[in-house]
Curated annotation (Swiss-Prot):
Organism, as annotated: Mus musculus (Mouse)
Species lineage: Eukaryota, Metazoa, Chordata, Craniata, Vertebrata
Biased composition, class Basic and acidic residues, residue ranges: 22-41, 96-107, 114-124, 936-948
Pfam family, one: zf-C2H2
InterPro entries in the cross-refs: Sal_C2H2-zinc-finger, Znf_C2H2_sf, Znf_C2H2_type
Protein name: Sal-like protein 1
Residues annotated with Phosphoserine modification: 591, 594, 596, 940
């Protein structure tokens, strides 16, 4: 058709039909009034002014010419705006009448539901694909959809007639009910303007003008020439061949899936309200055939599409009931607007779907226009109803929704879901018989269109909404065809599939959704649907019982939107079956199943096949109301048969499946469409999927890398193995220096840096006894052990003194020695603090060793204390030396003293376990001579190696403190046998003769240690002895190493100047012995008690004669270098203690805790403290073993009743005592210790050493006589037995008291809770 522009185009009114045709002037509403035609034969195109002598030519031209959806339609009725065309055309002309009716209908529709119209158009287009396509141009709703049909039909009349025209047949054959009737029914107010601003779906146009008269005059439209309509329908049919093919495929599917298909085909008859004016013209026959096909497809499509369209359209329809139409076939027609909307296809469709609906729904369809709408081709009906349809209901073109490409279906599905939601909401407030679809504002619809009905989230597109919905339904439509894993999005599947590329390069990824229910459906090949290779996952047994589903036929494999299957589950669950309409058309089962109002069908769409049922039954589903109607009607009719016929069979008559299968089958069909037929997929049902997810929560412990205790899934077996250590407390990696154990080698390596930076050794690198210089701290420690072992004299050695000996004993001794040092607190903590059986040490060995040379271990306990005390008095340097000795061997400082003191200590300890310090000091004073110490050793066989041990042994006699962990000292030699080695060397170097000298077991708790020094230090955990006291703050420490480390916390200026003076002037034995004697005794006493203050008289007790003994004096004399001032000049983030620099203040702060021993983060469960919150969190994982899986995923709170764990620790007594003490001390083992039995066994519980630290750290010095059996300690510790029960609590309480009491000094209560880190409260 030429589009030549005439200089002076004229419209000849001579042809009233043409004159009456609305002129569509592009986007503007300029309807040019028809000019009087010069000749009645000439017809002018209102848009391009082209003249045609034949009306048919003009009509054909308009199809291509009138593409603009904005149509200016002149409303010739007085109510219409002034833009109405001149009255020239007579209404008598059939065309004019049709136009008038269409215009009126349009006006009403526009006035009431502008947007719904657009939706309706689209729907109608979809339904009446053949017709719609032709008219699409006019309507512009959805090209080639029902809407187009309407416009095509309307072209003659008006685009607004699209709804009526869509049902071209009905329009032609019968006069359509006036929309006015619907308006009255729907209580719609008619706007007097034929211009309506609405959001036309699938278009960019926002304004449409329709002739109200044309719409309203639809009743008279029946006079339209059938031939013209038929020609238009034919053209539309040709243009919509593809859609017809899709429809046909759907019909085949229905036939295959449901036995009801027979019913659907029966629908071909096209009853219409008025007698159909079918012309003999083959076009009529063709239209009827098309209508039949549509009826079949529409039956399904209507069930689905009309559900969606009708839901949207019906929703759009007010409470309109279609009284005019008979409950049966005229269901749709009843609405005045509806009839016109019903095209021939509509009329045809109404018969099967309408009749079914009518029969099933009965009057309900009438009562609910939605139902009737659904009964009529949902599309046409929707468009017809669109004026009344609810604009809020997003109306995906029903045809598109049902037949469109996957993408449209997806969008439609989302829209349908939304529509269903809207319907459900509307219906809630409407009478059951009345389909109340109230129009919502266009903005509301747009908003609601992409709004999640579960969480109310709004999305910018249907696809985004669809994907989001899967998060609620749990649907994962995309299946990996290699491993069977499912994904919610194709993108995720693509990413996952890359993993298989290497192993299966020849297998292509399946990009189509696979219904989830098919995963469990057995197939003839044994390979699950959607899988390229046999699945490793067994099929559920119940599914095995079901018939094998043959792969879907091509019809089944319609190129339906892959999303449909996924959507269907949503639809099923989310909305009544109607929502699934379009989607359900593709996979009706699913939709119907979940959404259908019918309890059976709707619920499970038991007739999994019921897609067809939906087709037939769906029609009833105009909205939820329709949905329910359809469910009821469809279920009874097609529904029942459908239920009986298995969808899987692929034939309507297929074997019936049990009801459970039907839903699955429906899902299968859904899946089938998307994936080259039916692809298997997991159950698509929302509820079933959610149910599976819930059920699987407790079944997921099958992951090979999942922790069976806390159900945490690790990345690999090695990670899992390390993770288990957090539960078991296993620490296989031990520090050779301090004996601390770690769960990973990396942590151990990190820990070694602490030793490298350890100020006491690193800064000095000189032997505190002989002042020999060493470049390696480890070598120095070994060297010190040699001193303690007697291999090297305890007198200052020339610088050139050979280090070979030191080296000899070094490694082994050093290891233990170091272990002793750091072990004392941290390591012991790691060891369980439990059983501490008394293990007598061989006294003989002790004696021998003592006599030959002071037993470093024994000495370390009490002697070391005395020596240290003396040294402290003499100078901090000496004290540090003693500390080193004591730390390494327990207290190696004064061998002689150690022997004596240990023996004495043993006595004193036995005297009063409560105040080991006092007893120790007394002991040391009493027995400085090796003989005494030897005797002491004899006293407690366990003390054999170390006199110190005697103290512990005696403590063991009197005290049975709470279990103390061996801590790092816990180098536990696997051999606990007590072998008394009388060799002084054996005693001195238990490490070397470990095999021979194995009596390194604790007499109290039975723990074995790698060396005597470790054992001696361990004993202090029982005795609470803290022989090493800080001269600055009077804090006591169990090992010299700890004291040295603590000294680093004091600024050099804080230390007494005497400490820096090497008391070398004093005779190695003489002076140091004398001076320290007094001070030492007092200090020792104080230290033992954990109190700095000691009465001078106590110091007097210490006989100077004892002090003179070489080893002691030498050690005392040998000046110990205090932590040297930082070698490096201060820098930013510079540690003043060790001179180490850090990149950040936080790192420095954490580092400083290694010097201060501060451990601000304590475990609220077991009380262990940590230097960093991260360590605490890791530690908290050790308690997970005692928690139920329910706690999984919950963050363990670092905060707890023990608020003191915070940066500003609260007083221990209140918090810790109440909590820990209450539990451990209360005697309710089940509440505290028992629950940590496993942990304790693995060193997770508090170590005795920790406890001792706590006691000592927090105990302010209280003056007491050396000989007095009672002391603050005694008060706190009582006896070992007491300690066992009350140690955690009593000491704390006492500590608090003491801390707040006498000592004017501010005592920091230190609790080495973990890894020798302290928690400090002041």
């Amino acid at each position: 058709m030429s589009r030549r522009k005439q200089a002076k185009p004229q419209h000849f009114q001579s042809d009233p039909e043409v004159a009456s045709l609305p002129r569509r002037d592009g986007d503007t509403e300029k309807g040019q009034p028809s000019r009087p035609t010069k000749s009645k034969d000439a017809h002018v195109c209102g848009r391009c002014c082209a003249e045609f002598f034949e009306l048919s030519d003009l009509l054909l031209h308009k199809k291509s010419c009138t593409k603009n959806q904005l149509v200016l339609i002149v409303n010739e009725s007085p109510a219409s705006p002034a833009k109405t065309f001149p009255p020239g055309p007579s209404l008598n002309d059939p065309d004019d009448q049709m136009k008038d009716a269409a215009n009126k209908a349009d006006q009403e529709d526009c006035s009431d539901l502008s947007e719904p119209k657009g939706l309706d158009r689209e729907e109608s287009m979809e339904v009446e694909v053949p017709v719609a396509t032709t008219t699409t141009t006019t309507t512009g709703g959805s090209g080639g959809s029902g809407g187009s049909t309407l416009s095509g039909v309307t072209n003659i009349t008006t685009p607004s007639c699209h709804s009526g025209c869509s049902s071209g047949t009905s329009a032609i054959t019968t006069s359509l009910p006036q929309l006015g009737d619907l308006t009255t029914l729907g209580n719609f107010s008619v706007i007097n303007s034929n211009v309506i601003i609405e959001n036309l779906q699938s278009t960019k146009v926002a304004v449409a003008q329709f002739s109200q008269e044309a719409r309203c005059g639809g009743a008279s439209g029946g006079k339209l020439l059938i031939s013209t309509l038929m020609e238009q329908l034919l053209a539309l049919q040709q243009q919509q061949i593809h859609q017809l093919q899709l429809i046909e495929q759907i019909r085949h599917q229905i036939l295959l899936l449901a036995s009801q298909s027979a019913d659907l085909p029966a629908a071909p008859s096209i009853p219409s309200q008025g007698t159909l004016r079918t012309s003999a013209n083959p076009l009529t026959t063709l239209s009827s055939h098309l209508s039949q096909q549509l009826a079949v497809a529409a039956g399904l499509a209507q069930s689905l599409a009309s559900q969606s369209a009708n839901i949207s359209g019906v929703k759009q329809l007010p409470h309109v009931q279609l009284p005019q139409s008979s409950s049966g076939t005229s269901i749709v027609p009843p609405s005045g607007g509806t009839s016109p909307n019903m095209s021939i296809v509509t009329a045809a469709v109404p018969t099967p779907s309408s009749e079914k609906v009518a029969s099933n729904a009965g009057a309900s369809h009438v009562s609910s226009p939605a139902v009737s709408a659904s009964s009529s081709p949902a599309f046409a009906i929707s468009s017809l109803l669109s004026p009344e349809s609810n604009p809020l209901l997003p109306q995906p073109t029903p045809a598109n929704a049902v037949f469109p490409t996957p993408l449209p279906n997806i969008a439609t599905t989302a829209e349908d879901l939304n529509s269903l939601s809207a319907l459900a909401q509307q219906r809630k407030s409407k009478p059951p018989n009345v389909t109340a679809f109230e129009a919502k504002s266009t903005s509301d619809e747009a908003f609601f269109k992409h709004k999640c009905r579960f969480c109310a989230k709004v999305f910018g597109s249907d696809s985004a909404l669809q994907i989001h919905l899967r998060s609620h339904t749990g649907e994962r439509p995309f299946k990996c065809n290699i491993c069977g894993n499912r994904f919610s999005t194709k993108g995720n599947l693509k990413v996952h599939f890359q993993r298989h590329k290497e192993k299966y390069p020849h297998i292509q990824m399946n990009p189509y959704p696979v219904p989830e229910h098919l995963d469990n459906v057995p197939t003839s090949t044994g390979i699950p649907y959607g899988m390229s290779i046999p699945s490793e996952k067994p099929v559920t047994s119940w599914l095995d019982t079901k018939p094998v589903l043959p792969t879907l036929t091509t019809s089944v494999g319609l190129p339906l939107p892959p999303t449909l299957p996924s959507l269907t589950p949503f639809i099923k669950t989310e909305e009544p079956a109607p929502i699934p309409i379009s989607h359900s058309a593709a996979s009706p089962q699913g939709s119907v199943k979940s959404d259908s109002g019918a309890p059976d069908l709707a619920t499970r769409n038991p007739s999994g096949v019921p897609e067809e049922v939906e087709g037939s039954a769906v029609p009833p589903f105009g909205g939820k109301g329709e949905e329910s109607n359809m469910a009821s009607s469809a279920v009874p009719t097609a529904g029942n048969s459908t239920l009986n016929s298995p969808v899987a069979d692929g034939g309507p008559g297929g074997t019936t499946f049990t009801n459970p299968l039907l839903p699955l089958m429906s899902e299968q069909f859904k899946a089938k469409f998307p994936f080259g037929g039916l692809l298997d997929s997991a159950q698509a049902s929302e509820t079933s999927k959610l149910q599976q997810l819930v059920e699987n929560i407790d079944k997921k412990a099958t992951d090979p890398n999942e922790c069976i205790i806390c159900h945490r899934v690790l990345s690999c077996q090695s990670a899992l193995k390390m993770h288990y250590r957090t539960h078991t407390g296993e620490r296989p990696f031990k520090c050779k220096i301090c004996g601390r154990a770690f769960t990973t080698k990396g942590n151990l390596k990190t820990h070694y840096s602490v030793h490298r930076a350890m100020p006491p050794l690193r800064v000095q690198h000189s032997c505190p006894i002989c002042q020999k210089k060493f470049t390696n701290a480890v070598v120095l420690q070994q060297h010190i052990r040699m001193h303690m072992g007697g291999q090297i004299p305890n007198t200052p050695v020339p610088d050139n003194y050979p280090e070979s000996m030191e080296s000899d004993t070094g490694s082994f001794d050093e290891k233990n020695f170091d272990d002793l040092d750091n072990f004392s607190d941290e390591n012991m903590e790691e060891c369980p603090e439990g059983s501490i059986p008394d293990t007598p040490k061989s006294a003989d060995a002790s004696q021998d060793s003592l006599s030959s040379s002071p037993l470093p271990l024994e000495m370390s306990s009490i002697a070391a204390l005395e020596n240290q005390m003396k040294m402290i008095n003499a100078g901090l340097a000496e004290q540090l030396q003693a500390s080193l000795k004591s730390v390494e061997n327990g207290s190696m400082e004064g061998d002689v003293l150690t022997n004596d003191s240990s023996s004495v200590g043993g006595d004193m300890e036995s005297q009063s376990a409560g105040s080991p310090a006092i007893s120790e000091s007394t002991s040391s004073m009493q027995a400085l001579s090796p003989s005494n110490s030897t005797q002491e050793f004899h006293k407690s066989p366990g003390m054999e190696e170390k006199p110190q041990r005697v103290g512990p042994g005696e403590f063991a006699n009197g005290l049975s403190p709470t279990p103390v962990n061996g801590g790092a000292l816990d180098l536990t030699s696997s051999h606990a046998e007590k072998i008394i080695k009388e060799d002084s060397l054996g005693i001195l170097f238990p490490f070397r003769d470990r095999g021979k000298f194995k009596n390194t077991a604790c007499d109290i708790c039975g723990k074995t240690f790698a060396c005597q020094s470790a054992l001696d230090i361990h004993y202090r955990s029982h005795t609470k002895e803290r022989p090493f006291i800080c001269t600055v703050c009077n804090r006591g420490f169990s090992t010299k190493g700890n004291l040295k480390q603590h000294m680093l916390t004091h600024q050099m200026r804080d230390l007494p100047s005497q400490l820096f003076e090497p008391s070398s002037n004093l005779g190695p034995n003489q002076n140091s012995a004398v001076i320290p004697a007094n001070s030492l005794s007092s200090l020792i006493k104080t230290e033992v008690n954990g109190f700095v203050h000691v009465s001078p008289q106590d110091s007097k007790d210490a006989p100077t004669s004892h002090v003179p003994q070489g080893p002691l004096s030498s050690s005392a004399t040998s000046p110990v270098l205090l932590p040297a001032l930082p070698r490096r000049t201060p820098k930013q983030h510079y540690c003043n203690t060790c001179g180490k620099t850090f990149s950040s203040s936080s790192a420095l702060q954490i580092h400083e805790r290694t010097h201060t021993g501060e451990k601000p983060f304590a475990c609220t469960i077991c009380g262990r403290a940590f230097t960093t919150k991260g360590n605490l969190k890791v530690h908290m994982g050790t308690h997970m073993w005692n928690s139920t899986p329910a706690r999984r995923g919950r963050r363990l709170s670092v905060d707890g009743p023990m608020t003191f764990l915070g940066g500003n620790p609260v007083k221990f007594p209140e918090m810790f005592q109440k909590d820990l003490a209450a539990r451990s001390g209360s005697g309710d083992p089940s509440s505290f210790w028992n629950q940590y039995t496993a942990a304790l066994s693995n060193g997770l519980a508090m170590k005795a050493n920790e406890i001792s630290v706590i006691q000592n750290g927090g105990i302010p010095p209280i003056p007491g006589s050396l000989g007095s059996g009672s002391s603050p300690i005694s008060g706190l510790t009582g006896n070992v037995e007491k300690l066992g029960n009350s140690e955690p609590s009593a000491p704390l309480a006492g500590l608090e008291k003491m801390a707040s009491s006498e000592n004017g000094t501010n005592f920091r209560f230190t609790r080495f809770v973990e890894d020798s880190k302290e928690i400090v409260t002041s």
